[in-house]
Amino acid sequence: MDFALDSEHQLFRERFRAFANDVVAPRAAEIDRTGEFPWDVINAAAELGLLGVPIPEEYGGVGADGLAFTLLIEELAGACGSTALTIAAHTGLVCVPLLMFGNEEQKRRYLTPLAEGKMLGAFGLTEPQAGSDAGATRTTAVRDGNEFVINGQKVFTTNGSIAGVIIVTAVTDPEAGRRGISNIIVPADAPGVSFGQDQEKMGLHGSVTSQVYFQDCRVPVDNLLGRPGEGFRQFLQVLDGGRIGIGAMSVGIAQAALRAARDYALEREQFGQRIADFQAISFMLADMATQLEAARWLVYRAAWLKDRGLPHTTEAAMAKLFASEAAERICHKAIQIHGGYGYTTEYPVERYYR
């Protein structure tokens, strides 16, 4: 049992951290304040291959494994959660399923430009009445000759209105229940695709969250991902990886909050000493560090299992659950350690909390 990252993953982490510190972090506060989408940051990431880290080189990616991708999302999230979410959704929810289930023509036509960062991808799963109950999908795709005619609505679609392609879950066989759901590749500029106003959120302001509408949208039947009726099984597998990604985001944000709280506690003086020297503060920092390490290794283990083709559904869910809740607790304590300043935008901890 070896808990150390090997030299290859250490090198990946160093490169990802350098990019996050040099390119992403300087823009993070402005992105959060204005809500603008950071195309400059995303394009810079694409130039370094960071939009296709776990995708083989033959399809425009880096050819690294899932753990390397986890390290990327962790480092990006510590600098800017919006940037991390954008890339996590693009790669994990669009590139990866195309790699797993797409045929060769689909990989060449869609996966390669996505992995190269020539366009962004989105995954249209959630609907107004089908959130956690994804099997309740009402969007339909009716075959008409050599085309599918798609009608329906998707909500909470990350990257939706800025994507070049959307993988859409739709009912292709109404009589088959969950086995009648299929995944279909839909170009975002296809006739019949439209977008509502992007949703305003409490945090992650630089991440685009869209409502997507399909009205008699026609796409070739060749855009079916895998076989008819495999959509539910496919997105269950994909969401396992997505949960690891959310866990990695949580770890990255929590790490940034802990670092900020530690640094502030070492600088701030009250009653003639650093506040870090007060036992109440040191206990808080100790709890934060312990929860962070526990979360990190749950996430890494889930990624490790996935890379080896071992069952990881439960482990991915555990990692997401614990890491996300640990991040909330850590960020909350970071604000408390900052006192009144923690509530202001002068310090980054309020952004980490959101």
Residue ranges of each PLM-predicted region?
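Alpha-helical interface subdomain recognition
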Residues: 1-89, 101-106, 113, 117, ...
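Short glycine/proline-enriched turns and hinge-like loops at secondary-structure junctions
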Residues: 64-65, 133-135, 159-164, 177-180, ...
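Glycine-rich phosphate/pyrophosphate-binding beta-alpha loops
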Residues: 81, 131, 155-161, 204, ...
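Short beta-strand-to-turn element immediately C-terminal to the catalytic PLP-Schiff-base lysine
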Residues: 100-102, 142, 168-172, 185-187, ...
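A short, Trp-centered hydrophobic/proline-enriched beta-strand micro-motif
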Residues: 117-125
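Active-site-adjacent elements of ketosynthase-type condensing enzymes
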Residues: 129-140
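Flexible, small-/acidic-enriched active-site or ligand-binding loops
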Residues: 136-138, 189-220
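A short core secondary-structure module
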Residues: 147, 151-195
